[in-house]
């Protein structure tokens, strides 16, 4: 680290749900170069989603090489590497061969047997303990039940795990293990807090949760802070940051004080509100999770996950084929003065926070002969904003904090109609940053702080620039009337699908 002054770049590896990316930042936190590769989505059965871990590693390695080549840089000019990743996605691999024993089970995966696992946990009376200890709800979303499914269904795997032959990790653990040639098996607190196996109060793997899910302790990674040197990669640059994608975005937005919140608009929407050093227990369906403090140490956050955000627009394009491109939605939504009473509830894979209803299903309400395609497109965009309000209202009730402004990031924030409607339905200012790569930026910031590339949080705050502020324009009565219609529509979609095992 003595020659840090001669190294002028940080690489953020952003391993997402549909693609692997590498983003190179300079000392001013500007993007120098970006490389991206998509990888295959596997759907072996309805509701099942899997990735090939070897393809994830191959694409992530390739984009790092591509980004350096495009920028004309050599790896010895890189001070450190930061990793941010899709969370909850679960990998189990052979410690000797480095080969996965099964595909990665993705965070979106709702396989019916996994729902049965969750139902059994509830029947056995574990739901309250899970919430108190891990901050999570008993839902197939999290890693613990995915790991249990692998150990239950891959022959001999549980015994091999007990013998120390198999390792478990979320995507960050898998990548660092591969990048360090099998020398480092670690995760960070943010990713560990998404497994349903981790006690967020003692900051240790929880013995009772391991017993409940029958997970051998021997296969779990060591848990460390989000900002420290974990080991040298094969290209010699140190791996110096790990953060789950949403916690990385929260840090990249400089939401490091209690009461600050951000929403990332991606495939789903993910709202996090920093609650400082207090783990706020939710009474309204939020998750209590671990975030990054000012120097990557443990802080706490409330989180609400909306399962279908950008995927709703993809549905308009790919299944309904009423738009050619996602960017078309802003034009069509702006052609009509309102949605003409139409509400679209995109519960394609159930409802996330604050409802946590895996049996809800999507529906269109309020259709009349006067409804046009424009109204449906507008209703689709509005559904993203309504779901955001569902979550934010619950967060504010739990935390006792009244949000002054919502910071936003993700692909959909380029849609000015959506951002304005978001401000309108919240009655709160929405702040769109000039730097859109906030997830990667958060990983870069954490890596830079760990290796001395950047000296302080104050230095980083000076690099944050708001590109546009959206002020609420709807009056209170109009806002609440629209939202009441949304709540009515949501209530009609609840508990639609038959429960597993029900007659």
UniProtKB/Swiss-Prot annotation:
MF-aspect GO terms: ATP binding; glycerol kinase activity
GO BP annotations listed: glycerol catabolic process; glycerol metabolic process; glycerol-3-phosphate metabolic process
Residues that bind sn-glycerol 3-phosphate: 17, 87-88, 141, 245
Organism: Pseudomonas tolaasii
Similarity field: Belongs to the FGGY kinase family.
Keywords from the named record: ATP-binding, Glycerol metabolism, Kinase, Nucleotide-binding, Transferase
Gene: glpK
Cellular compartments per GO CC: cytosol
Catalytic reaction(s) noted: glycerol + ATP = sn-glycerol 3-phosphate + ADP + H(+)
Enzyme class (EC, first level): transferase
Positions of ATP binding: 17-19, 267, 310, 314, 411
Pathway noted in the entry: Polyol metabolism; glycerol degradation via glycerol kinase pathway; sn-glycerol 3-phosphate from glycerol: step 1/1
Annotated EC: 2.7.1.30
Function: Key enzyme in the regulation of glycerol uptake and metabolism. Catalyzes the phosphorylation of glycerol to yield sn-glycerol 3-phosphate.
Gene3D superfamilies cross-referenced by the UniProt entry: 3.30.420.40
Name listed for the protein in its UniProt record: Glycerol kinase
Pfam families referenced in this protein's UniProt entry, alphabetically: FGGY_C, FGGY_N
Residues given in the record as ADP binding sites: 17, 21, 267, 310, 411, 415
Activity regulation: Inhibited by fructose 1,6-bisphosphate (FBP).
Residue positions binding glycerol: 87-88, 141, 245-246
């Amino acid at each position: 680290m003595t020659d840090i002054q001669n190294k002028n770049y940080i690489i953020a590896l952003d391993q997402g749900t549909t693609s692997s990316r590498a983003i190179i930042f300079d000392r001013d936190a500007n993007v120098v170069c970006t490389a991206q590769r998509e990888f295959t989505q596997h759907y072996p059965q309805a509701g099942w989603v899997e990735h090939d871990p070897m393809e994830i590693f191959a694409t992530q390695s390739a984009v790092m090489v591509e980004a350096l080549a495009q920028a004309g840089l050599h790896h010895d000019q890189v001070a450190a590497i930061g990793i941010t990743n899709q969370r909850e996605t679960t990998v189990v691999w052979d410690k000797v061969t480095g080969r996965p024993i099964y595909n990665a089970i993705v965070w979106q995966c709702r396989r019916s047997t996994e729902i049965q696992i969750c139902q059994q946990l509830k029947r056995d009376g574990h739901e309250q303990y899970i919430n108190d200890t891990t901050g999570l709800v008993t839902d197939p979303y999290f890693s613990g039940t995915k790991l249990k499914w692998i150990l239950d269904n891959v022959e001999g795997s549980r015994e091999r795990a007990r013998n120390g032959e198999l390792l478990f990790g979320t995507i960050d653990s898998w990548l660092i293990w591969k990048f360090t040639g099998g020398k480092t098996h670690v995760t960070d607190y943010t990713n560990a807090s998404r497994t349903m196996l981790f006690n967020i109060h003692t900051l240790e793997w929880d013995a009772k949760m391991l017993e409940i899910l029958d997970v051998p302790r021997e296969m779990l990674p060591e848990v460390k802070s989000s900002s420290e040197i974990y080991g040298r990669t094969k290209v010699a640059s140190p791996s110096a940051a790990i953060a789950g994608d949403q916690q990385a975005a929260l840090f990249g937005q400089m939401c490091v004080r209690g009461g600050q919140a951000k929403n990332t608009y991606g495939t789903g929407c993910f709202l996090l509100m920093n609650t400082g050093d207090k783990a706020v227990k939710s009474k309204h369906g939020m998750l209590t999770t671990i975030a990054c403090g000012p120097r990557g140490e443990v802080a706490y956050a409330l989180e609400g996950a909306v399962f279908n955000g950008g995927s709703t627009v993809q549905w308009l394009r790919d299944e309904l084929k009423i738009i050619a491109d996602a960017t078309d939605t802003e034009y069509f939504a702006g052609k009509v003065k309102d949605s003409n009473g139409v509400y679209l509830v995109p519960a394609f894979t159930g409802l996330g926070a604050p409802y946590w209803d895996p049996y809800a299903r999507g529906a269109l309400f309020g259709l009349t002969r006067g409804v046009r395609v424009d109204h449906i497109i507008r209703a689709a965009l509005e559904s993203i904003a309504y779901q955001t309000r569902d979550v934010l209202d619950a967060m504010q009730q739990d935390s006792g904090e009244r949000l002054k402004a919502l910071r936003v990031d993700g692909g959909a924030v380029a849609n000015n109609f959506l951002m304005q409607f978001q401000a309108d339905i919240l009655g709160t200012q929405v702040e769109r940053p000039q730097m859109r790569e906030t997830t990667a930026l958060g990983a870069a910031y954490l890596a830079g702080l760990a290796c001395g590339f950047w000296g302080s949080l104050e230095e980083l705050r000076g690099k944050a620039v708001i590109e546009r502020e959206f002020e609420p324009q709807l009056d209170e009565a109009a806002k609440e009337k629209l939202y009441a219609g949304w709540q009515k529509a949501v209530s009609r979609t609840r508990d639609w699908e038959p429960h597993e095992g029900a007659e």
